[in-house]
């Protein structure tokens, strides 16, 4: 098919490329009917350029479209070559003072909390950095795409509207000039023509609905039968459904289907098939059939290719228009005129209207293109922004209706543009007054919530999924209303008043439909069967909370509006209460000679609703009357006399009683829906406009009525009237007959009622209720939150109510009430309450939940005990009420109140006769305290002529009336003071009596004689001193008692030791032996310790006893006993890698014998240090395996460990492990017990001997491999072969280990091989020993790096688990050859040896530059016993070790010299060169000679010696660790201290001369020839000639990448990152690899790749190439660190970025500026260096099971 198309397509291209834009434009300039000309041109050319085949070629299409279609338009517009025309236009244009940058997805945006008018006012990064706001309290978020930078918009900022860049452009914007003055008449006319035609064309073709014919003026003569099957996006179907359907319908691979689905999701549509009509129709029917089962089917259309072509070009044109108008404001103005010009069809016929009204029919891509155009044109031209806003408002209802029917998110709907108009204060006011916008929004909202009950209230019963979906969409209207109200008017016009009040009426209608919705009735007898729907109503309430507050703020800003609004609200409340007394019979209540009429109503029997927005709004307005003093200025205008207090309090009181009854457990059978409703009613998100307002409404009612009447009504509603109105009710009640439940219930109700009274009198911190301001209110909230416990900033913010701007006002007051404590390495910064604020603590603070109240009480009492104060928590001193609420305090001294208090105290005095509770008494005491504080304040503030009418002290001193003669309240308190059963409340009662006396004294003293008062204080003082002395005495007694007890205990201990002397003697000996094993305490401090060689320090072998963690049995570690093992974890590692791009192509054929110095991938072993018997471990592992198989049959979930890969959790510490290391005695001591001669060979002799032995072995090896028929010849050859003296190649040493130990040696060896090479286990494979030695070497190198990086001494105190792991690993590696084939190990030794001492049989060996010398050393030393065991000539193993070590050290020195950097640092030493420097210079000259002078010029000896010392240090340290663990020689004490470099000490410990070059001098004869052979290697030559690289020494430590100090620069970097697979599209989840700095696109289909036959996400794939399976990433949009290991393991980790309050912000929800915390970043780096990432993930997954369910491999 393709080949047929090719020539034809090329021909088309040729004809297109021959078009001349200039000629076409010239033709258009002459044309009489320009529209027809342009349309004909487009009809002819567009289908030839776009949509030529199944797959689009965007680059080619764009190039041709520019040449053939857009070029002529640009020529026509400019009247000349656009390359000159546009720059001229640009020059004539004045730069804009508006920034207007449209945000990309994920770009950082900044808002200033001090200056922004509302949170939608944001700046782009560039403007922000150049603005004054960077030093303010700013918020940083990532944009969801769309939206503008508001720099330059004076209405958006209270100050600093311009950044430095845009301020330069503000000089001449005094008066708004017409931008067209800068353009010539011709240009204006031509622009007008071309814009009108192209804009109309684009709108027409994009809104075209026919699928196979074009508009008449675009139809072609000959039409091909080519169609597209076009799939459209919807938000209903999932990715998986779409992918599956496409695979079936168009027969494509999964990868192609994913590609299609990704494009559909991104652009809104994609063709999935190209061909004739029938072919496409068939695919369509399959798609529709497959997706219509559960939901509506996917939208698919079969469209003619020419229509798709024109639509694609239509989009291109809109983008083109957007870029053209960027050249000049004049062009922008013309485009706006064209767009908003009414067409011939009148209303809604302008192009802009047509596009807006077709919005929901357009696909995603088309929408975003035209929204973009509107933003860069209409919204950037202030004159037309206004006109556009009017069109938007006129079409508002229709647009919202379309949005409700649409299923796309609001972000891609034109309705989302509302934020651009409604938040601009002048535009919003204009729309309210001219277009009645407020009423329109609310009415549109009401239209969509049609379900009502018989009373006309909203009914959300049993929402279907679709209704719930619609309801979610309807909520966006509330957001629009919030935008309109967000900035309060500073001045009011009459029209604004009128229209606002019309809107307020509409709002009251909305609230009226909510008043009393979702009513509930108490379930009696049986539990409710179906949980009623409650969420929708609360969602509505939550969304409206801010709107209700803002409505009140608007009312408060104008007195006339406030009065009118109050009247309207009252009228609506009267309507709601229309049937308030109907059908409910009146009753009369009387207590203490007061009586009141009310209705019979029981909350526990009738319907009751928690939703009372109208009452609550009235309460809010009533407080505003008080706050703004309107109530006192214009009482005649207010209907205050018409108010019926009983009616006002009725519904809020019912609501509070409902809460009390729920708490008393009376509504248990109503299920969770009610519990949830009560929770949200009090919750910080809703309480401001629910619970708080109910309290205010009750305060309002009480302040207007006789408090006795109120209390009686309240008792009646609480269903407690009987108890307090009949004197002996309590006695009867407590007799045996009654139900315990009922007693408990009534007690709780009494407690709740008393709590309510405390609230009504005590809660006066709302401005308008009490004489306070807003900051007092916030301070009080914070004090009470911090009195529970110290809190982090974010916790505090969560517990405070936010206003519409997401502000709590906390920052302005927090310094006054709290201290800030900075965080450590983990945790967060905390605020602690200042001690002086504790006195403001109110135990019955109304925003405490039950749990918080008890915590706060506990905390405050504890604090008082610590400060040696009494533990009473008296009520705090309160601010006075505002005049409107002043009469509220009288409730405390009303007769009914005193009766209630008296009754409860009476119960407490006769505590056995009645049912009462301590909580009840505690509340009564609190109320008495409040009354006393109140009276005290009245007396303190009294003026001459006033009499204090508050006489609580007198009333509580009076005993009861005649017949009963009950004692006075005061008398009862004095009785209770000494009651033993009220220990807890003693302090409080004492405080009350003390305060009572003080108040009494104040009453008695007239204003002229204040003497009595001072006496009172003196008396108080003396009593306080007494208290103090008493406490001191008690403390002293307690101290003496403690000392006596301690003395007795130590005497008993001594006695016990004396009696059991011999027992202690044994344990002490044992302790000494175990500590010797642990601490390697030096044997003799004065002798030199040597780790290897014939002079090795001989250490007596300590016996080692260990205990199995599984069976608790103790056992000695011996050669012949059962194996003991350590749990271990082996993993591949690139932590030390200097080359991450290396990859083993074919692990089956790879030979790991030589490790390259770049350490590209090593095998690391770690252990938690816990010991088990091998057989116990085997049993444990089998049970884990069996359990896992059972679990897999039940659940297809991953666990934190992968049993199939041999993983398990350590039974003790749950540390992830995948194998076990056997515990062994030092293996060298076992094999080294042969006779050793005293004269050992020197290096030269030893090398010759070894070379001969190797030759013999190779000869025999050859013999064995030759076929038998040549046997006669062979025997001659054997004679010919002179075996070196004492060498017996046929000897096989006896292996001393028990079977169990051998098995474990094999187990661990195989595990290392399997993990290290990523192959299947095979214990016979010759590479197993190599991998064991490699793991030992690599692990030691890792530890050495960690110690060096942290400047810790080499043999300082290592953590136990590390020490055990290194010891066991080294001993294992040294013993492993015993279970491998001797000849294989010998073969490895020969090859390793040949890399340093060349022989003829090994040709292809790496050159000296390409061998890591420490790996080579470990390999040679550990393979050597396989050769040495056949040598009976008396050469000891130690000699071999020493010579190998010296040889490798010399090779390493040569490596260092060859690669040393010879740039001089200008630091030449003045002194004469020392011995080392001369020696190293001589050696360098030798090298210079052997390399044929290719080596660089000879630097100074000082410089060379410094290079050698620095370069060899890591090697020496690793060697010291290795030989220390291999031979068990303790480390010299000098190396155990931090500080100096320890070079000399290391040399001495390792049997090296301090002047390392002496090694060369002592063995010069053999060394010179070896050096020559090393330098002759062609690779060395290539390196010296600059043709290749080599590693330099010392290797630098790898670090994680450098992160920027400020997090926003990371966000910015990530927002510029395009997904590599989706054609320049911004990535949705940019993720930064912290190891190498690559940015990846994670968590989306686009970047999945295949790894080992499975689909994996970009991060997982990257971990394999960069971290050999382990990855550390930072998810930039979430500010979250991601750890990955393998394909199934991962966890999230706390990021290293903190805000100013020491907290992380995962998910960037709070938006506080974040800065890098270096310590936390170091901690992550340390985890990486220590290879602990996998362990960290394991622990996290065990601790949090939700992590196991995450699909890590697709991240």
UniProtKB/Swiss-Prot annotation:
Broadly expressed, with highest levels in skeletal muscle, kidney and pancreas. Present in acinar cells of the pancreas (at protein level). InterPro entries: ClpS_core, E3_ELL-like, E3_ligase_UBR-like_C, Ribosomal_bL12_C/ClpS-like, UBR-box_UBR2, UBR1-like, UBR1-like_winged-helix, WH_DNA-bd_sf. GO terms for molecular function: histone H2A ubiquitin ligase activity; L-leucine binding; ubiquitin protein ligase activity; zinc ion binding. A peptide binds at residues 148, 150, 153. Keywords: Acetylation, Chromosome, Coiled coil, Isopeptide bond, Metal-binding, Nucleus, Phosphoprotein, Transferase, Ubl conjugation, Ubl conjugation pathway, Zinc, Zinc-finger. The modification Phosphoserine is found at residues 476, 1694. Pfam families: ClpS, PRT6_C, UBR1-like_wing, zf-UBR. Belongs to the E3 ubiquitin-protein ligase UBR1-like family. Interacts with UBE2B; promotes the UBE2B-H2A interaction and the ubiquitination of histone H2A by UBE2B and UBR2. Interacts with RECQL4. Interacts with TEX19; does not lead to TEX19 degradation and stabilizes it. Interacts with CASP8. Interacts with ATXN3. Interacts with UBE2O. E3 ubiquitin-protein ligase which is a component of the N-end rule pathway. Recognizes and binds to proteins bearing specific N-terminal residues (N-degrons) that are destabilizing according to the N-end rule, leading to their ubiquitination and subsequent degradation. Recognizes both type-1 and type-2 N-degrons, containing positively charged amino acids (Arg, Lys and His) and bulky and hydrophobic amino acids, respectively. Does not ubiquitinate proteins that are acetylated at the N-terminus. In contrast, it strongly binds methylated N-degrons. This is E3 ubiquitin-protein ligase UBR2. The lineage of its organism: Eukaryota, Metazoa, Chordata, Craniata, Vertebrata. The gene is UBR2.
């Amino acid at each position: 098919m393709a080949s047929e198309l090719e020539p034809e397509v090329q021909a088309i291209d040729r004809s297109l490329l021959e078009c001349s834009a200039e000629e076409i434009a010239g033709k258009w300039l002459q044309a009489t009917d320009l529209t027809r000309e342009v349309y004909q041109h487009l009809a002819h050319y567009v289908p030839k350029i776009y949509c030529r085949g199944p797959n689009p070629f965007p680059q080619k299409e764009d190039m041709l479209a520019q040449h053939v279609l857009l070029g002529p338009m640009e020529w026509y517009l400019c009247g000349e070559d656009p390359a000159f025309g546009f720059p001229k236009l640009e020059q004539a244009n004045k730069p804009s003072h508006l920034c207007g940058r449209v945000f990309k997805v994920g770009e950082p945006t900044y808002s200033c909390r001090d200056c922004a008018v509302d949170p939608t006012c944001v700046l782009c990064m560039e403007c922000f950095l150049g603005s004054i706001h960077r030093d303010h309290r700013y918020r940083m978020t990532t944009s969801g795409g769309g939206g503008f930078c508001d720099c330059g918009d004076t209405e958006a900022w209270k100050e600093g509207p311009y950044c430095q860049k845009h301020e330069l452009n503000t000089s001449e914007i005094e008066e708004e000039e017409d931008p067209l003055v800068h353009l010539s008449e011709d240009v204006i006319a031509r622009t007008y023509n071309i814009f009108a035609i192209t804009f109309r064309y684009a709108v027409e073709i994009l809104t075209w609905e026919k699928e196979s014919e074009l508009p008449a003026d675009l139809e072609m003569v000959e039409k091909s039968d080519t169609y597209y099957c076009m799939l459209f996006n919807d938000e209903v179907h999932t990715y998986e459904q779409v992918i599956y359907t496409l695979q079936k319908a168009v027969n494509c691979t999964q990868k192609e289907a994913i590609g299609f689905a990704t494009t559909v999701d991104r652009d809104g549509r994609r063709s999935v098939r190209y061909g004739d009509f029938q072919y496409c129709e068939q695919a369509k029917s399959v798609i529709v059939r497959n997706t219509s089962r559960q939901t509506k089917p996917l939208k698919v259309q079969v469209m003619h290719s020419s229509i798709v072509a024109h639509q694609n070009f239509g989009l291109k044109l809109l983008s083109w228009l957007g870029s053209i108008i960027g050249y000049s404001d004049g062009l922008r103005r013309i485009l706006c005129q064209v767009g908003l010009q009414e067409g011939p069809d009148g209303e809604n016929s302008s192009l802009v209207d047509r596009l807006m009204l077709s919005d929901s029919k357009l696909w995603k891509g088309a929408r975003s293109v035209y929204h973009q155009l509107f933003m860069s044109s209409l919204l950037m031209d202030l004159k037309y922004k206004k006109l556009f806003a009017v069109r938007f408002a006129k079409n508002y209802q229709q647009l919202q209706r379309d949005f409700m029917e649409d299923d796309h998110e609001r972000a891609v709907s034109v309705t989302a543009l509302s934020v651009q108009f409604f938040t601009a204060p002048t535009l919003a006011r204009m729309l309210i007054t001219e277009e009645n916008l407020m009423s329109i929004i609310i009415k549109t909202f009401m239209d969509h919530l049609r379900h009502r009950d018989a009373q006309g209230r909203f009914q959300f019963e049993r929402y279907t999924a679709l209704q719930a979906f619609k309801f979610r969409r309807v909520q966006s209207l509330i957001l629009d209303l919030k935008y309109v109200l967000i900035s309060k008017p500073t001045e009011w016009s009459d029209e604004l008043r009128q229209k606002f009040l019309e809107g307020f009426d509409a709002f009251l209608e909305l609230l009226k439909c909510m008043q009393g919705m979702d009513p509930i009735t108490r379930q009696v007898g049986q539990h409710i069967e179906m949980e009623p729907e409650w969420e929708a109503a609360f969602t509505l309430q939550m969304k409206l909370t801010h709107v209700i507050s803002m409505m009140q703020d608007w009312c408060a800003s104008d007195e006339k509006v406030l009065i009118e609004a109050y009247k309207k609200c009252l009228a609506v409340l009267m309507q709601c209460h229309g049937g308030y007394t109907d059908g409910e019979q009146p009753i009369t209540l009387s207590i203490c000679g007061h009586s009141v009429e009310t209705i019979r109503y029981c909350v526990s029997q009738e319907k009751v609703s928690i939703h009372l927005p109208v009452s609550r709004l009235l309460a809010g307005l009533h407080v505003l009357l008080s706050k703004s003093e309107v109530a006192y200025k214009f009482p005649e205008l207010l209907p205050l006399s018409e108010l019926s207090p009983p009616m006002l309090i009725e519904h809020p009181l019912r609501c509070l009683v409902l809460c009390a009854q729920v708490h008393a457990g009376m509504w248990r059978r109503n299920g969770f829906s009610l519990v949830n409703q009560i929770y949200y009613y009090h919750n910080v998100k809703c309480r401001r406009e629910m619970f708080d307002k109910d309290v205010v409404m009750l305060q309002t009612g009480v302040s207007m009525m006789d408090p006795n009447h109120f209390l009686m009504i309240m008792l009646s509603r609480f269903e407690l009237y009987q108890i307090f109105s009949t004197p002996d009710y309590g006695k009867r009640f407590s007799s045996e007959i009654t139900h315990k439940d009922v007693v408990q219930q009534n007690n709780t109700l009494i407690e709740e009622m008393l709590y309510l009274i405390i609230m009504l009198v005590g809660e006066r911190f709302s401005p308008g209720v009490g004489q306070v301001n807003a900051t007092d209110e916030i301070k009080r909230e914070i004090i009470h939150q911090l009195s529970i416990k110290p809190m982090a900033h974010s916790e505090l913010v969560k517990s405070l109510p936010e206003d519409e701007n997401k502000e709590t006002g906390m920052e302005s007051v927090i310094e006054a009430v709290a201290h800030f404590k900075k965080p450590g390495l983990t945790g967060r910064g905390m605020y602690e309450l200042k001690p002086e604020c504790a006195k403001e603590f109110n135990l019955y603070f109304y925003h405490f939940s039950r749990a918080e109240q008890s915590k706060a009480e506990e905390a405050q009492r504890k604090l008082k005990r610590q400060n040696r104060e009494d533990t009473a928590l008296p009520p705090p001193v309160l601010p006075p009420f505002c005049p409107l609420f002043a009469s509220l305090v009288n409730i405390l001294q009303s007769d009914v109140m005193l009766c209630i208090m008296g009754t409860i105290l009476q119960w407490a005095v006769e505590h056995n006769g009645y049912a009462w509770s301590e909580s009840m008494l505690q509340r009564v005491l609190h109320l008495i305290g409040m009354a006393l504080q109140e009276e005290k304040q009245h007396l303190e503030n009294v003026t001459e002529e006033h009499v204090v009418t508050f006489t609580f002290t007198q009333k509580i001193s009076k005993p009861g009336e005649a017949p009963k003669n009950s004692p006075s309240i005061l008398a009862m308190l004095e009785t209770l003071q000494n009651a033993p059963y009220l220990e807890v409340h003693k302090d409080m009662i004492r405080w009350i009596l003390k305060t009572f006396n003080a108040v009494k004294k104040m009453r008695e003293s007239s204003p002229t004689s204040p003497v009595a008062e001072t006496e009172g204080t003196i008396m108080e003082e003396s009593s306080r001193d007494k208290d103090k002395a008493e406490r001191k005495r008690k403390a002293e007694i307690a101290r003496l008692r403690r000392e006596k007890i301690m003395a007795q205990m130590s005497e008993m201990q001594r006695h016990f030791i004396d009696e059991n002397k011999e027992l202690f003697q044994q344990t002490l000996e044992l302790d000494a032996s175990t500590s010797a094993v642990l601490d390697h305490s030096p044997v003799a401090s004065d002798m030199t310790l040597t780790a290897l060689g014939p002079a090795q320090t001989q250490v007596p072998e300590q016996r080692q006893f260990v205990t199995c963690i599984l069976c608790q049995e103790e056992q000695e570690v011996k050669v012949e006993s059962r194996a003991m093992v350590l749990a271990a974890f082996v993993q591949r590692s690139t932590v030390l890698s200097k080359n991450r791009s290396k990859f083993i192509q074919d692990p089956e054929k790879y030979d790991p014998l030589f490790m390259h110095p770049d350490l590209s991938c090593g095998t690391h072993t770690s252990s938690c240090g816990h010991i088990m018997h091998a057989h116990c471990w085997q049993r444990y592992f089998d049970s884990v395996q069996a359990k896992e198989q059972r679990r897999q049959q039940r659940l297809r979930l991953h666990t934190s460990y992968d049993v199939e890969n041999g993983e398990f959790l350590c039974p003790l510490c749950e540390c992830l492990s995948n194998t076990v290391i056997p515990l062994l005695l030092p293996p060298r001591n076992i094999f080294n017990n042969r006779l050793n001669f005293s004269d050992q060979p020197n290096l030269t002799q030893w090398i010759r001997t070894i070379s001969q032995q190797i030759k013999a072995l190779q000869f025999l090896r050859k013999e064995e491999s030759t076929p038998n028929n040549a046997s006669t010849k062979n025997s001659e050859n054997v004679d010919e072969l002179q075996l070196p003296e004492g060498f017996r190649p046929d000897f096989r040493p006896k292996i001393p280990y028990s079977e169990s130990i051998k098995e474990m040696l094999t187990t661990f060896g195989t595990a290392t091989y399997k993990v290290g090479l990523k192959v299947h286990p095979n214990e016979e494979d010759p590479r197993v020993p190599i991998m064991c030695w490699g793991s030992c070497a690599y692990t030691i190198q890792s530890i050495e790096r960690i110690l060096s990086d942290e400047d810790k001494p080499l043999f300082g105190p290592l953590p136990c688990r590390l020490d055990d792991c290194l010891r066991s690993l080294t001993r294992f590696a040294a013993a492993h050859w015993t279970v491998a084939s001797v000849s294989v190990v010998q073969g490895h030794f020969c090859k390793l040896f040949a890399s340093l001492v060349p022989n003829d049989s090994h040709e292809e060996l790496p050159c000296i530059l390409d061998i890591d010398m420490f790996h080579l050393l470990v390999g040679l030393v550990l393979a050597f016993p396989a050769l040495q065991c056949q040598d009976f000539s008396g050469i000891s193993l130690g000699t071999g070790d020493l010579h190998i070590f010296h040889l490798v050290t010399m090779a390493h020195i040569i490596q260092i010299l060859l690669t040393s950097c010879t740039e001089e640092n200008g630091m030449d030493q003045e002194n004469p060169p020392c011995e080392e420097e001369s020696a190293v210079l001589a050696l360098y000259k030798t090298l210079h000679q052997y390399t044929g002078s290719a080596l660089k010029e000879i630097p100074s000896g000082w410089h060379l010696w410094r290079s050698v010392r620095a370069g060899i240090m890591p090697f020496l340290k690793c060697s010291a660790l290795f030989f220390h663990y291999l031979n068990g020689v303790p480390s010299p004490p000098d190396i155990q201290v931090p500080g100096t470099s320890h070079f000399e000490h290391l040399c001495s410990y390792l049997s090296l001369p301090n002047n390392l070059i002496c090694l060369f001098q002592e063995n010069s004869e053999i060394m010179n020839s070896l050096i020559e052979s090393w330098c002759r290697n062609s690779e060395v030559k290539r390196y010296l000639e600059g043709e290749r690289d080599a590693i330099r020494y010392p290797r630098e430590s790898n670090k994680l990448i450098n992160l920027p100090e400020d997090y926003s620069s990371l966000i910015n970097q990530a927002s510029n990152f395009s997904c590599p697979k989706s054609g320049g599209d911004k990535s949705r989840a940019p993720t930064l690899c912290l190891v190498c700095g690559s940015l990846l696109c994670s968590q989306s289909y686009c970047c999945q790749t295949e790894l080992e036959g499975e689909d994996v996400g970009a991060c997982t794939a990257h971990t394999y190439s960069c971290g050999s399976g382990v990855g550390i990433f930072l998810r930039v949009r979430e500010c979250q660190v991601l750890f990955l290991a393998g394909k199934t393991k991962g966890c999230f980790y706390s990021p290293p970025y903190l805000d100013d309050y020491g907290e992380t912000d995962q998910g960037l929800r709070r938006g506080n500026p974040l800065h890098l915390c270096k310590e936390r970043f170091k901690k992550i780096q340390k985890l990486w260096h220590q290879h602990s990432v996998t362990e960290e993930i394991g622990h996290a997954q065990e601790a949090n099971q939700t992590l196991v369910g995450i699909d890590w491999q697709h991240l």
